[in-house]
């Protein structure tokens, strides 16, 4: 039976990325950000590596100062094939980070919701480097990566003037299986059925929840932990890496809640807390099968 292996490594993330991956590897970068690598393929999802929001909202009600330092700088990143953004919010579409990546890697392409055209414009990317994403329009990026954007509801749907979704998730079809990164979303009518139709083995879901006082300030929320777990159980998803916490003091949860909930799954679901300093390895051949119990190693 295939495994989702968790390896706790010593030293910096940059140092550990010097070795070529043998399987599909995921590294959490904070908030909703992940680096995904496999042999011959490397891409980012929603990487927030700057501190731009602290300055943008310095005079605001809620401080956006980072609670965690970026685990890696753009200068330290290995070569990247693709950068994915799920929506226009600055901790998901981080223009300073995108601009630096584009300057460092001339061949990297950026997959961005078509409805985020105005937000990405300030990054100064050449048009041939951008792939516009729209819900349910499959994107064949390479022989080892096919991506399907899926509608997301960040406490509700939003559309641009052309009717295109402002919020997206992505289904990543890689050699080891199917990974679902939901973007910022809640469960909405039809989402479960859509995900069951594709059958991902691994879900990357936000668990920071939502609160009326934040909604009133135009800060929409997401799944809470219980909802994310139930969604995976209902969708027969084998493993959940819970994320979107620990970045901003006003909009997070206690990560110990994830640790407390994990043993209660009784082998129905691998509930895994996002952590820095961990390599999550998705062993090739996992597609179509349940994962065995997660293993953790020290390196």
Residue ranges: model-predicted function:
Residues 66, 109-111, 115, 186-276:
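Cap/insert and terminal regions of metallo-dependent hydrolase folds
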Residues 41-43, 81-82, 109, 177-179, ...:
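Structural motif
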Residues 2-21, 112-177, 261-284, 292:
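Metallo-beta-lactamase
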Residues 11-18, 41-85, 96-100, 157, ...:
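Pre-active-site segment of Zn-dependent metallo-hydrolases
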Residues 22, 29-37, 140-201, 219, ...:
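Catalytic core of the metallo-beta-lactamase
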Residues 52, 89-93, 117-119, 137-140, ...:
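Active-site environment of divalent metal-dependent phosphoester hydrolases
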Residues 52-58, 65, 71-139:
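Active-site HxH/HxHxD metal-binding segment of metal-dependent hydrolases
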Residues 36, 46, 87, 94, ...:
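Divalent metal-coordination and catalytic microenvironments
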């Amino acid at each position: 039976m295939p495994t989702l292996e968790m390896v706790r490594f010593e030293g910096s993330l940059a140092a550990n990325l010097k070795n070529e991956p043998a399987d599909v590897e995921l590294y959490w970068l904070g908030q909703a950000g992940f680096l995904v690598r496999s042999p011959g393929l490397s891409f980012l999802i929603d990487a927030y590596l700057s501190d731009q929001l602290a300055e943008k909202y310095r005079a605001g009600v809620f401080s956006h100062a980072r609670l965690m330092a970026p685990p890696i700088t753009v200068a330290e990143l290995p070569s990247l094939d693709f950068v994915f953004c799920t929506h226009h919010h600055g901790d998901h579409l981080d223009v300073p980070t995108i601009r630096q990546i584009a300057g460092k890697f001339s061949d990297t392409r950026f997959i961005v919701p078509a409805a985020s055209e105005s937000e990405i414009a300030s990054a100064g990317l050449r048009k041939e480097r951008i792939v516009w994403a729209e819900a349910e329009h499959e994107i064949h990026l390479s022989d080892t990566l096919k991506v399907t954007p899926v509608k997301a509801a960040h406490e509700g749907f939003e559309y641009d003037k052309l009717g295109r979704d402002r919020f997206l998730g992505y289904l990543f079809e890689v050699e080891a299986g199917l990974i679902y990164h939901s973007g910022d979303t809640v469960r909405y009518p039809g989402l479960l059925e859509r995900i069951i139709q594709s059958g991902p083995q691994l879900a990357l879901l936000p668990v920071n929840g939502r609160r009326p006082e934040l909604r009133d300030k135009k800060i929409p929320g997401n799944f809470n932990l219980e909802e994310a777990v139930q969604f995976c159980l209902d969708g027969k998803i084998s493993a959940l890496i819970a994320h979107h916490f620990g970045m901003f003091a006003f909009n997070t949860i206690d990560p110990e809640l994830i640790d407390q909930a994990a043993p209660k799954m009784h082998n129905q679901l691998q509930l895994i807390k996002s952590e820095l300093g961990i390599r999550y390895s998705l062993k090739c051949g996992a597609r179509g099968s349940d994962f065995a119990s997660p293993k953790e190693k020290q390196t």
